[in-house]
Structures are given as structure tokens and as C-alpha cells.
């Protein structure tokens, strides 16, 4: 069966800072409760996941600090830009996440928001451990070294 190509307007919103600030352990896909104008804004890629994280309250998971720009044609019924949004997970998944957060001191970070089957909005939540400053420096040094090697190889191939 051939894979369907993703439509250009529906590429996912990605939290690039999550990999830099956290050591991501596991990922879980969750649905999200949104209003109609929020879905329309997300179709136009008008969202920001940079500071988004999930919090467990009373056996429910909420996505905090997820900014969705108000829909330009929304009128007076538009949604607030930042508000807690409920995530849809099974009870066992919530209990598992709650145990990890309480026992191991891990954090729930939103890493990606995308449309599944061009209908439903899904959020990828990562369970992660915050990195220390020296870990971030090590990652930056490794990345710089890889870029130097790539540049050197590219320039050496150019003169052959």
C-alpha cells in the first residue's frame, strides 16, 4: 500500500526547543479538545508550542501555555489565545504518566501538533527529564563538530 503524502498546508507544528531543553524518554499521542476557530487557526499553522507543557489535574491532563493565534475571520466568537486545553487519553495512560511524573520527577512536554487523517488534531506528548546546563553545552559542542565535519567534506569535494 502506498503512503499518502502530507498536504503542504498541514505540516505539523514542532517544538524544536524540547529536544534542546529536555532528555526525551517516551512519546504518547493524545487528542485535544478545541473550538472550531482554534482548528481553523491550526490549519493555517498559527500556533506556538515553544513553552507548552502538560499538567495532570484531578485525573485529567491539560495542555498549558499552548498559544493558538485567534482566527482572523472568527469575529466576536473567537477563542482566547492561551488557555488550558484538555487532552484526551485513556485512564491507564493518565495513571502511567502520573506515576512517572511523581516518582521519577519527569516532565510532560508537548513536542508536536498535527492533523491525523486530515480530520483530527493530535498532540504528541513527550515524557522528559530536564537537562542541566553542562548537558546542553555538550550537545551544542557535538552539533558544532558535526557541522565542521560536514563543511570540511563539502569543501574538499568541491575542489576535486
Swiss-Prot record:
<feature type="region of interest" description="Disordered">
    <location>
        <begin position="132"/>
        <end position="160"/>
    </location>
</feature>
<protein>
    <recommendedName>
        <fullName>SsrA-binding protein</fullName>
    </recommendedName>
</protein>
<dbReference type="InterPro" id="IPR023620">
    <property type="entry name" value="SmpB"/>
</dbReference>
<dbReference type="InterPro" id="IPR020081">
    <property type="entry name" value="SsrA-bd_prot_CS"/>
</dbReference>
<keyword id="KW-0694">RNA-binding</keyword>
<keyword id="KW-0963">Cytoplasm</keyword>
<comment type="function">
    <text>Required for rescue of stalled ribosomes mediated by trans-translation. Binds to transfer-messenger RNA (tmRNA), required for stable association of tmRNA with ribosomes. tmRNA and SmpB together mimic tRNA shape, replacing the anticodon stem-loop with SmpB. tmRNA is encoded by the ssrA gene; the 2 termini fold to resemble tRNA(Ala) and it encodes a 'tag peptide', a short internal open reading frame. During trans-translation Ala-aminoacylated tmRNA acts like a tRNA, entering the A-site of stalled ribosomes, displacing the stalled mRNA.</text>
</comment>
<dbReference type="InterPro" id="IPR000037">
    <property type="entry name" value="SsrA-bd_prot"/>
</dbReference>
<dbReference type="GO" id="GO:0070929">
    <property type="term" value="P:trans-translation"/>
</dbReference>
<dbReference type="GO" id="GO:0003723">
    <property type="term" value="F:RNA binding"/>
</dbReference>
<dbReference type="Pfam" id="PF01668">
    <property type="entry name" value="SmpB"/>
</dbReference>
<dbReference type="GO" id="GO:0005829">
    <property type="term" value="C:cytosol"/>
</dbReference>
<comment type="similarity">
    <text>Belongs to the SmpB family.</text>
</comment>
<feature type="compositionally biased region" description="Basic and acidic residues">
    <location>
        <begin position="135"/>
        <end position="146"/>
    </location>
</feature>
Amino acid at each position: 500500500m502506498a503512503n499518502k503524502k502530507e498536504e503542504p498546508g498541514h505540516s505539523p507544528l514542532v517544538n524544536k526547543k524540547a529536544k534542546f531543553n529536555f532528555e526525551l524518554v517516551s512519546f504518547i499521542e493524545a487528542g485535544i479538545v478545541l473550538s472550531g476557530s482554534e482548528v481553523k487557526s491550526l490549519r493555517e499553522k498559527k500556533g506556538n508550542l515553544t513553552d507548552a507543557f502538560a499538567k495532570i489535574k484531578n485525573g485529567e491532563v491539560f495542555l498549558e501555555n499552548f498559544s493558538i493565534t485567534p482566527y482572523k475571520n472568527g469575529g466576536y466568537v473567537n477563542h482566547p489565545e492561551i488557555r488550558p486545553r484538555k487532552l484526551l487519553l485513556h485512564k491507564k495512560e493518565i495513571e502511567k504518566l502520573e506515576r512517572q511524573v511523581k516518582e521519577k520527577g519527569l516532565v510532560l512536554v508537548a513536542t508536536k501538533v498535527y492533523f491525523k487523517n486530515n480530520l483530527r488534531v493530535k498532540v504528541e506528548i513527550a515524557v522528559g527529564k530536564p537537562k542541566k546546563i553542562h548537558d546542553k553545552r555538550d550537545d551544542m559542542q557535538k552539533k558544532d563538530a558535526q557541522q565542521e565535519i560536514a563543511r570540511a567534506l563539502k569543501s574538499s569535494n568541491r575542489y576535486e
